[in-house]
């Protein structure tokens, strides 16, 4: 379902359109592929079983892109053969209809057009999120080229530009504004492809990321432009696809900056990223970037990837990186980070007790490979025993913080670990007592006063005798660093797409 780790968007995390829609079912009604959340009592028995993803009339399909789709689309203008549409206005005012639909393999160029979509009766919801129902411009089988145009929507489910299935959208030098819920700026789902250059995108509703993807994923490449989301539960980028962004301004004024779910990837290059998520009692914490698995069925379970090379991150509330109930790879290289005064962590890699059911409590940690390359960092790294964290510092990276083992969301615990590897050019400035499973240090470890920090084994062995007030407790220690399993940030050239001559 739409991007709502904060849980305030109207569709509900992983719920069908109209989150209040419920019905009593039996075990016979649950089929393979349905997603269920099970709440256990103190004895480990199932207390409640809630089906989070099955067809109950709201357009909800199976997990991982196996949804049934829609039979047909209502549209004002359908283009099934090659055409150029220029210097004109395309308007849609009907319920859940498109202003322009590209089908039958057509190639359609929109040049200097004003495209609008306004409806007070549209429903939005999953059919809009997954299939593009109600989007201003939708390509399902064919290619849309959009340039020097304006796209505005004021209806639920009113995405600006949507690529679905065999549809591809190329867009440049265009302004996109959406007003209502479930209305992303540019959107790909079901394997669609969308390529954008120098756009100005603003969204104002809930579940309305400026750069948005959903069930079935796809490919999105963004080069230049400004992307702003203002609604709650509306990150600048909601990622259930493979997305690469270069030289862009990405701002979420009412949400986390980035949400990545499941087997998907986001790579940012020389971009400026800002998040401002509000605190919410449903959540265990507050974050700026989240990598997780919601169990809604909207993304295939697997390794989430976040890479950022250059640019800036500004966190206006909460901690920085939060990962839970997933596997993930995070790599930062030379990113300038601005922290808020109340930041609780730099990285939290733990299980969760989130009220929306992100995995089974006590068994929903994160397996995270984190690499800092030429990267300055501040804040604590929080981990627990149901998570696996490999934390690499290479090429002159610095960390001012502590490694904190926090079992609050680990249930009965597990055999997870936190392994820290520091190369010869990197420095850890310790700000509090720390607990690490394995420490491999070829670099420098001191406190803020330059004092040596004691490193003591859990068996009582003193590896380093220090004069600092702080102690690092380790399961094992070595004064060398093998960084071969660290992550190398990919080059933008691997994802850059040549701008078509028609744009």
Region spans (language model):
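Disordered, low-complexity segments in secreted/periplasmic proteins that are enriched in proline
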Residues: 1-34, 42, 48-71, 295-297, ...
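Surface-exposed edge beta-strands and adjoining flexible/disordered loops or tails in beta-rich
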Residues: 50-55, 165-171
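Extracellular/surface-exposed low-complexity segments
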Residues: 60-66, 293-318, 322-433, 442-503
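N-terminal segments that cap or nucleate solenoid repeat domains
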Residues: 64-122, 470-472, 479, 487-503
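Beta-strand-rich solenoid/repeat architectures in extracellular/passenger domains
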Residues: 65-68, 81-96, 111-132, 142-157, ...
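Glycine-rich beta-solenoid repeat tracts in large extracellular/virion proteins
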Residues: 71-78, 98-104, 123, 133-140, ...
